[in-house]
């Protein structure tokens, strides 16, 4: 795993800003764009677009979203 994290939290898709680390299908992705009801996620291997209403984000030591 690339970053140290302190748990996860489920939030609505609109709360993910670019750079937020997201857990999706048991993999870590970085949110890159949140437009037109779609969230674009990327990692070193793939880029995907999701329309899920609720997503799971990683938290840092202060309980805030982990950003890169």
Where are these regions (language model features)?
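Intrinsically disordered, low-complexity, charged/polar segments
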Residues: 2-6, 48-68
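Mixed-charge, Lys/Arg-rich low-complexity intrinsically disordered regions
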Residues: 1-17
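Basic/aromatic-rich interaction segments and small domains that mediate binding to polyanionic partners
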Residues: 28-53, 57
């Amino acid at each position: 795993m690339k970053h140290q994290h302190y748990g996860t939290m489920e939030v609505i898709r609109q709360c993910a800003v670019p750079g937020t680390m997201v857990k999706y299908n048991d993999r870590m992705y970085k949110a890159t764009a949140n437009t037109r009801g779609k969230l674009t996620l990327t990692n070193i291997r793939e880029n995907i677009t999701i329309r899920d209403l609720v997503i799971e984000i990683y938290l840092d030591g202060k309980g805030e979203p982990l950003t890169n």
